[in-house]
UniProtKB/Swiss-Prot annotation:
Protein name: MFS-type efflux transporter phmH
Organism of origin: Phaeosphaeria nodorum (strain SN15 / ATCC MYA-4574 / FGSC 10173) (Glume blotch fungus)
Keyword tRNA processing annotated: no
One Gene Ontology CC term in the entry: plasma membrane
PANTHER family per the UniProt record, alphabetical: MAJOR FACILITATOR SUPERFAMILY, MAJOR FACILITATOR SUPERFAMILY (MFS) PROFILE DOMAIN-CONTAINING PROTEIN
């Protein structure tokens, strides 16, 4: 085992009995308990661990780079297709078939999607090929966190999640520059060249290296005591089907609402209603006695600290996308910056985010306390929103640089510490489903994090556009103000009209930030529902890294017969 401690068996991921993982038991390790101040023992990680971790980091880098490059050039549809793929189904499959095979499978799907993109002969084929990539990328993003949880004690997970985000943020930072340069020359020819260059020089080589590292070094234990038919019976088909259907219905409505159709149009109202009802139905199904193997066990939400941490995770992703999507509008529509220069202007938060993800993880690992980190980081968020609301044409560069740095501090510290709060109150047997649920609620946060501020922005802009000439106003109807928020479009107007349009953008953005203050404040207040629970320093899992030598294979085979645990 990685931690050097003995592995103890834990139950399958089913509904836990009331005595397991409940708040009453875990209150013994609350914020006033002495174990929180204990210094964790030094953990030794073998070379095989670091090589496997390198494979995970390379996979995360490719996934982040892929999404950020093409999304810059094809933002609305492509970003939407990638927004709802982190389904808890991956967590359940990883429990039943093991982390190694599911992770390798997700990576292969991602690489396959890349190949399909390269062979696409039309925009529609490209979009659906990107959807295949999204399915693989969703599994990659979730399974990386899950495997880290399997290989690293809870107290130390923040360090590794922060280190992982250095790789992920590198991809997310480089991508917009490449995509922005191509967007400046936007045409189908340039976009097609972008796709081909990305696939043949980034996705396939780096993805191939990552896949090879995973195949060679990601050898983890796996509880293999069930037949294939029994595993299939334990997949929550009903719950997963409802969740996937509801998510795509919401995704469709939020993608086209206010743009292609009005919000009251049946094309939008119907799927949005169906999606929201579906989420409620999925929740009740998971809580019902008929669901024997829930994909999102009720235990996750019955515990106060875990439930609060899930909500905070959702809100933090919502606010992150709130800022990530509307600062570029300010740069391009108000400061008249090109897409490439707007990408440069986002560097402060792009640099601060991964650095403070590492800092936040290190603080939690050192102190064993996550609640203080959450109070500080969520307290910064409404401040950032408030400061952003005063930005206009005359704002100095120092202002928007500092505001973005503050967001990087806030978002970075949260991204690497919320999972520990989710899992602190849960037994180790819930690692897979808790990571799956955590990924799902964060994925929902990304969807609403674009849709809510976009609706606010478009509604406010429509109100302000009454002062425009009717011919000009027609250009901004049905959500086109967001789509037309580019320097090239704004500069196409005569100076007088241009200033009126820019002022409308300033006022619409101000409303977006003002309402963002409320969302940030709610996130801050929700931290008070968390309890400071002792973070375990020992690792007890059925899925830890295998360090056995080849000469011990026979002994391992006997272990399979005795307790059903094998090595992948």
């Amino acid at each position: 085992m990685v931690s050097g401690t003995d592995t103890t068996e834990v139950g399958a991921t089913t509904k836990a009995p009331p005595s397991e993982g409940t708040e009453g038991i875990l209150d013994d390790h609350s914020s006033n308990s002495q174990p929180q101040a204990e210094k964790p023992a030094k953990t030794h990680y073998p070379l095989s661990f670091w090589l496997a971790f390198l494979g995970l980091c390379c996979t995360g880098l490719v996934s982040a780079l892929d999404g950020s490059i093409v999304a810059t050039a094809l933002p609305s549809i492509i970003e939407s297709l990638d927004g709802g793929d982190d389904y808890p189904l991956y967590g359940q499959l990883a429990d039943l078939w093991g982390r190694r095979y599911v992770m390798i499978g997700a990576t292969i799907i991602f690489i396959l999607g890349s190949g399909l993109c390269g062979g696409s002969s039309s925009m529609n084929m490209l979009i659906w090929s990107r959807a295949v990539q999204g399915i693989g990328a969703g599994g990659i993003n979730m399974l990386i966190d899950m495997i880290i949880c399997d290989l690293v004690p809870m107290r130390e997970r923040g360090n590794f999640i922060g280190l992982l985000f250095l790789f992920v943020s590198l991809g997310a930072t480089i991508g917009p520059f490449v995509g922005g340069i191509l967007t400046d020359r936007a045409s189908w020819r340039w976009l097609w060249l972008l796709i081909l260059l990305q696939i043949f020089y980034i996705n396939l080589p780096f993805g191939g290296v990552a896949l090879l590292l995973l195949i060679l070094f990601l050898h983890v234990k796996w509880k293999n005591d069930l037949s294939t038919m029994e595993r299939l019976r334990r997949v929550d088909v009903i719950g997963n089907s409802i969740l996937i259907g509801a998510t795509f219905a919401i995704l469709y409505a939020l993608t086209y609402g206010g743009t292609r159709y009005t919000w009251s149009d049946p094309h939008i109202a119907a799927p949005l209603t169906i999606g929201l009802v579906g989420l409620v139905a999925a929740f009740f199904w998971e809580m019902s006695p008929w669901c024997k193997y829930p994909v999102m066990p009720p235990l996750h939400f019955q515990n106060r600290t875990s439930a609060a941490a899930f909500f905070i995770s959702f809100m933090c992703m919502l606010l992150a996308f709130w800022i990530n999507f509307f600062y570029p509008v300010y740069f391009q529509a108000v400061l008249i910056a090109s897409p490439t220069r707007a990408g440069v202007y986002t560097l402060p938060r792009a640099i601060a985010f991964p650095l403070f993800a590492a800092v936040g993880g290190a603080i939690v690992s050192k102190t064993g306390r996550y609640r203080t980190v959450h109070l500080v980081s969520t307290g910064i968020m409404p401040l950032v929103m408030g400061l952003s609301s005063i930005l206009d044409q005359g704002s100095s560069k120092a202002e928007w640089v500092i505001w973005q740095l503050l967001f990087g501090v806030s978002g970075g510290m949260m991204i690497s510490t919320t999972l520990q709060a989710v899992q602190a109150a849960l037994p180790e047997s819930e690692v897979a489903t808790s990571v799956g649920t955590w990924s799902f609620v964060r994925s929902l946060g990304t969807i609403w994090g674009l849709s809510i501020p976009a609706a606010i922005f478009n509604n406010r802009f429509d109100q302000l556009s009454t002062q425009f000439d009717p011919s000009i106003r027609a250009l901004f109807t049905r959500g086109q103000a967001y789509e037309h928020g580019t320097a090239k479009f704004i500069q196409s107007f005569d100076p007088e009209t241009r200033q009126i349009v820019i002022q409308a953008y300033i006022e619409a953005l101000k409303r977006v930030w003002q309402i963002g203050i409320v969302f940030g404040g709610v996130t801050f207040l929700s931290v008070f529902f968390e309890k400071e629970i002792h973070l375990r320093t020992e690792l007890k899992t059925d899925f830890g890294l295998d360090e056995k030598k080849k000469g011990e294979v026979a002994k391992e085979e006997n272990d399979v017969e005795n307790n059903g645990t094998t090595v992948q």
